[in-house]
Amino acid sequence: MPKTLTEKLNAIKAAGKGIFVPYIMAGDHEKGLDGLAETIHFLEDLGVSAIEVGIPFSDPVADGPVIEEAGLRSLAHGTSTQALVETLKTIETEIPLVIMTYFNPLFQYGVENFVKDLADTAVKGLIIPDLPHEHANFVEPFLADTDIALIPLVSLTTGIERQKELIEGAEGFVYAVAINGVTGKSGNYRADLDKHLAQLHQVADIPVLTGFGVSSQADLERFNAVSDGVIVGSKIVKALHQGEPIQDFIRQAVAYQK
C-alpha cells in the first residue's frame, strides 16, 4: 500500500496542478520551536502541498548561507532534535511534513527511536542529504512498516541507469537537485537541465520535484513544465526571518496549473 505522502502528492499531480513544497528551519523563529506550529499553519492556510522541516546542524554541507544562518539562529534558540520531536507530537496539520536532516543528528538520537517517536505525528517523509544510497540500509529497515518515506536525492549529472537504481522502490517523491552546489544558489543551471529533468521524469513512477536554487516566478514556470513541482527553501526562509511578504509568491506556486 502506498505511503500517505505518495498518495497525497499523486492526487495533486492527477488534478493537473503543480506540487509546491516550501522548506522551513525548525526553531528559526523569535519564539524558537514554540513558533513552529504558527509557521506550519501559515503555510498550510496558503495551500502548500507539503512542508519540509529542517533540523539544524552545525556542519550543514549541502546548505547555502541563508539556510546555514537559519540553522545557527535555531541552535542559538536552543533547538535540539529531542525538543523538535516533542514539538512535532503536539502539532496538528492536514498536510504531510517531511524532515530534512543530516545523518549525524539522526545517529545521535538513534534512528529506530527517531522513527518510533515520530509514528503518531504528521511527519510522512525523511530526507538525509549526506546519506549515500549505498548506506540507505542504515535507515530503511526502520521505515519499512511505517508511513514515513525515505526520499531519494538525484543529481541531474547522474546517468540514467544510476537514476533508476536510486529511485527503485522509492516512495513519496524524487528530489531532483537542479544545481551542482549548495542550496539557494539560483540561476546557475546546466544548459541541458530541462532535458535531464524530462529524462528523470520518464523513469520515475512517483512525483519528481525540483529543488536547490528555485527562487523566482520564472523558475516556478520552468520547472513545473518539466517536473511535477518545486521545492523552495532559501527564498522562504529569508522572507520569514526578515518579515518580508511571501504570500503572493506561494499563492502563485500553489495555483500553478499543468
Curated annotation (Swiss-Prot):
Stored PROSITE patterns:
TRP_SYNTHASE_ALPHA (PS00167)
Gene3D superfamilies named in the record? Aldolase class I
**Entry similarity comment:** Belongs to the TrpA family.
Q: Do you know which SUPFAM superfamilies this protein is assigned to?
A: Ribulose-phoshate binding barrel
Cite the record's note on assembly.
Answer: Tetramer of two alpha and two beta chains.
- Catalytic activity annotation: (1S,2R)-1-C-(indol-3-yl)glycerol 3-phosphate + L-serine = D-glyceraldehyde 3-phosphate + L-tryptophan + H2O
- Any one Gene Ontology molecular-function term assigned to this protein's record: tryptophan synthase activity
The annotated active site, in chain numbering, is 52, 63
A Pfam family hit: Trp_syntA
The UniProt entry's GO CC annotations, sorted and at most eight, read: cytosol
HAMAP family assigned to the protein according to its UniProt record, in alphabetical order: Trp_synth_alpha (MF_00131)
Organism of this sequence = Streptococcus pneumoniae (strain P1031)
The protein, known as:
Tryptophan synthase alpha chain
Any idea of its EC number?
4.2.1.20
Alphabetical UniProt keywords: Amino-acid biosynthesis, Aromatic amino acid biosynthesis, Lyase, Tryptophan biosynthesis
Q: What does this protein do?
A: The alpha subunit is responsible for the aldol cleavage of indoleglycerol phosphate to indole and glyceraldehyde 3-phosphate.
Q: Which pathway does this chain act in?
A: Amino-acid biosynthesis; L-tryptophan biosynthesis; L-tryptophan from chorismate: step 5/5
